[in-house]
């Protein structure tokens, strides 16, 4: 039997205790912000120290401020001291952690140094101490929303990962975007290709093997129950979910060769979209769910194509690169990973590109290394991806509109797939 080409490449895993952020591109002059820690009674000194680095990192990735290096100690209601003038901040972000043994609480306020006015203030709580990174993510996302800055709601979203544990076995992990928080939700057997089921991230689809046959399941995070969706010989993978959550784009291979199918969750029926003797995989909704972007080898090498949600004629979207095998969509935008030829004897290079289905627009997003698994954020303004550069692996975050890129160096391991 001819093997199905799985175009989601095996990538190194991401299990770092703390992420080190590197700003790749710098542009506009941003207002300076000083961080002050007003914590006086918190049970975990380790979490307190790591939280200070996390909130500074979140502000940096948010790309709206220049974060002044170093965290000052103060009390929550203390007036601004004259000593901060030397650092010339436009804002002071002051926070206080409390608890830490059971419920963890966070108070945070943003102070305008011109007149000492409080521009934003809020309280947060988290019952599970292990989820402490989300306190920082939520606060910084709320500040951006309150000040009408570029939206970063994705910061408070989770990433779902499949990680190989040994040959023939993979577990599924829920993590924050820095992968500082990790929670194993499925283990035992082969659990691969997780895909969020809805914008609330209350459930995800994944593929496993049931009696030797690839089977698609839905896992509910609240009830910890799984429900069977469908199965198919060869392979079955949920690559995208419609905006209303009622339909899935599946890659299935009932007759050995993979094609794209539209699966209706209400009627539990599948409609074939592509019918090709080679390989069609990784379908993604685009153009308000009216079309499908997918990867196919119909021109020889894997490349990016599009067709109507009802099937029919196929349009080639990309005309460069030797292997365009990883793709994600948002509205009418497509981000993909493209293998490019470098100098003789040089290491292979996969760069990320952004195109539009409505124009000839194309933008190169990365320049070096092996950059794969691009995934749009929920608002389309950011892209997460996996970056390999020599012996160093990292999670990359691209702020598309801000023209900034960040990398988080990580420890090694083997990652099967990722969804944001």
Regions found by a protein language model. Name each.
Residues 79-139:
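Amphipathic beta-strand/beta-sheet edge segments enriched in Tyr/Trp
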Residues 22-83:
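Short beta-strand->alpha-helix linker/helix-N-cap micro-motif
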Residues 159, 203-205, 248-249, 292-293, ...:
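Hydrophobic beta-strand positions that form the internal "hydrophobic ladder"
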Residues 176-192, 220-235, 263-279, 307-323, ...:
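Multi-bladed beta-propeller domains
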Residues 154-155, 198-200, 243-244, 287-288, ...:
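Residue-level detector of Asp-centered blade-edge/turn motifs that repeat once per structural unit
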Residues 165-170, 207-215, 231-234, 251-260, ...:
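A flexible loop/linker signature enriched in serine peptidases of the S9 family
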Residues 17-30, 117-119, 123-182:
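C-terminal/domain-edge helix-coil "capping" segments
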